[in-house]
Swiss-Prot record:
Matches recorded under HAMAP family: DapL_aminotrans_1
Cofactor: pyridoxal 5'-phosphate
Family stated for the protein in its record: Belongs to the class-I pyridoxal-phosphate-dependent aminotransferase family. LL-diaminopimelate aminotransferase subfamily.
Residues noted as binding substrate in the record, renumbered to the chain: Y15, G42, K109, Y132, N188, N288, R384
E.C. code: 2.6.1.83
Species of provenance: Lachnospira eligens (strain ATCC 27750 / DSM 3376 / VPI C15-48 / C15-B4) (Eubacterium eligens)
Protein name stated in the entry: LL-diaminopimelate aminotransferase
Length: 404
C-alpha cells in the first residue's frame, strides 16, 4: 500500500490567499450587484512595459523560424539574462556577484518553496512574525516545523521572531539559535525595512553561529530611502552566509509571465560542500528552465527604456501607497509601511480580530484586504492593504473605508 507525505495533513486549512478567494467568491455569488475592490493579494494591475512587450514580440517571431528557434533553456538560465542581472543589480551596487552565481527560475515563490530541498530536515528555521506564509508552509510540508498548535496559531519547532510596533516591525536577533533564518525586506506584509547597519548585524550573527540567511528581496525596487540596502550582498561577509531570492513580478509586473532568480555565492559552504553545487544539481534535475521569450523579456527590463518604463510603474503604485497611507491616517487608523514597499499595515479598529475586520470591510465597504493573522501569530489584530490596484479603485476604496 502506498503512503502519503502526512506532513501535509498538519497544515491548517488552505493556503491563505486561497481561503480569501473562496470567501470573496461566496460573497460575490450571494451579492452579485456589489462592486468589490480587491486590495488583498499582491498582484499587479498595470500592463507590461512597452520595452518588455517589444522583446516578447521579437522573441516570439524568432521562435517561428528554424534558424532562430530556441528549445529547452540552459538549466541555470541564458547567459544574456544572468549577465544583465549581475551587472545591474549587483556590480552597479559594488557587490561581488558573478553571472554564474545567478540561477534563473520561474519566480521567487517557487524558489522560496524549493530551496529547502538542499537542506536537512533536521534544520531549525527562524522566521519574522508576521511574514510571507510560503516560508513556513513549505517547511511544514518538508517535516521541519513540528506540530501546529491551533490555540497559538504557531508551529512547535519554528523560531518566531516577533515584529511588532514596539520593534518598528523589525526582528531582533533570536535567543534560540536557528540553522536557517528567513528575512524579507522590504517586508511582506508590514512594509518595514532595516538599515544596512542593522542588516550587517544579521550577517555577522549568521556567520558567527553557522546559520544561513535566506533573504527575500522581491520588493527592493520600491526602496526610496538611501540608508535601506537593496541587496544583502551590500553587507560584508554575506557571501559566506546568505542566499538571495529575487522576482520580476513586482519590479516589472511579471506576475502573469513568471520570472525570478536566486543568488548563491560559491563561498557559501557546509563543510567542504558548496550550496551552489547542491542547488545547481537540484535545479538541473527538477527544472527545465524559464522560457526563452520570458528571459528575453527579463533582459529588456534592464534596458534604458525598460528601466524608465518600469520605474514609472513603480512610482504609480507608490502613489497608490501614499494615497492609502494618508487616507487611513486621516480616518484615525494606526498605520505603517507604504514608504519603501507597496504594502500598508494597519491596526484593526475596536479590538477586532484580523478575520473579523476582513468580514467587516468586505460586507460594509466591499473592499478586500488580507488578515494579518494569516502571516503569523504576531499579525493578529492587524490587516494588510496593497497598492497594486488602479489609482481610481484605490481612491474609491479609501472613500468607502473612511465612510464607515
Amino acid at each position: 500500500m502506498f503512503k502519503i507525505n502526512d506532513n501535509y495533513l498538519k497544515l491548517p486549512g488552505s493556503y491563505l490567499f486561497s481561503t480569501i478567494g473562496k470567501k470573496v467568491a461566496a460573497y460575490q455569488q450571494a451579492n452579485p450587484d456589489k462592486e468589490i475592490i480587491r486590495l488583498g493579494i499582491g498582484d499587479v494591475t498595470q500592463p507590461l512595459a512597452p520595452a518588455v512587450i517589444d522583446a516578447l514580440h521579437k522573441s516570439v517571431d524568432e521562435m517561428g523560424h528554424a534558424e532562430t528557434f530556441h528549445g529547452y533553456a540552459p538549466d541555470l538560465g541564458y547567459e544574456f539574462l544572468r549577465s544583465a542581472i549581475a551587472d545591474h543589480d549587483y556590480k552597479k551596487r559594488g557587490c561581488d556577484i558573478s553571472a554564474d552565481e545567478i540561477f534563473v527560475s520561474d519566480g521567487a515563490k517557487s524558489d522560496s518553496g524549493n530551496i529547502g530541498d538542499i537542506f536537512s530536515v533536521d534544520n531549525k528555521i527562524a522566521v519574522c512574525d508576521p511574514v510571507y506564509p510560503v516560508y513556513v508552509d513549505t517547511n511544514a510540508m518538508a517535516g521541519r516545523t513540528g506540530d501546529y498548535i491551533p490555540e497559538k496559531q504557531a508551529w512547535s519547532n519554528v523560531v518566531y521572531m516577533p515584529c511588532t510596533a514596539e520593534t518598528n516591525f523589525a526582528p531582533e536577533l533570536p535567543k534560540e539559535t536557528p540553522d536557517i533564518i528567513y528575512l524579507c525586506f522590504p517586508n511582506n506584509p508590514t512594509g518595514s525595512t532595516i538599515t544596512k547597519d542593522e542588516l550587517q548585524k544579521w550577517v555577522d550573527y549568521a556567520n558567527k553561529v553557522g546559520a544561513v540567511i535566506i533573504y527575500d528581496a522581491a520588493y527592493e525596487a520600491y526602496i526610496s530611502e538611501p540608508d535601506v540596502p537593496h541587496t544583502i550582498y551590500e553587507c560584508e561577509g554575506a557571501r559566506t552566509c546568505a542566499i538571495e531570492l529575487r522576482s520580476f513580478s513586482k519590479n516589472a509586473g511579471f506576475t502573469g509571465v513568471r520570472l525570478g532568480f536566486t543568488v548563491i555565492p560559491k563561498d557559501l559552504k557546509c563543510g567542504d560542500v558548496t550550496l551552489h553545487s547542491l542547488w545547481a544539481r537540484r535545479h538541473g534535475t527538477k527544472f527545465n528552465g524559464a522560457p526563452y521569450i520570458v528571459q528575453r523579456a527579463g533582459e529588456a527590463v534592464y534596458s534604458e527604456a525598460g528601466q524608465k518604463q518600469t520605474g514609472e510603474q513603480i512610482a504609480y503604485y507608490m502613489n497608490n501607497a501614499k494615497t492609502i497611507l494618508e487616507g487611513l491616517k486621516s480616518a484615525g487608523y494606526t498605520v505603517s509601511g507604504g514608504v519603501n514597499a507597496p504594502y500598508i499595515w494597519l491596526k484593526t479598529p475596536d479590538k477586532m480580530t484580523s478575520w473579523e475586520f476582513f468580514d467587516y470591510l468586505l460586507e460594509k465597504a466591499n473592499v478586500v484586504g488580507t488578515p494579518g493573522s494569516g502571516f503569523g501569530p504576531s499579525g493578529e489584530g492587524y490587516f494588510r492593504l496593497t497598492a497594486f490596484g488602479s489609482y481610481e479603485n484605490t481612491v474609491k476604496a479609501l472613500e468607502r473605508i473612511k465612510a464607515l
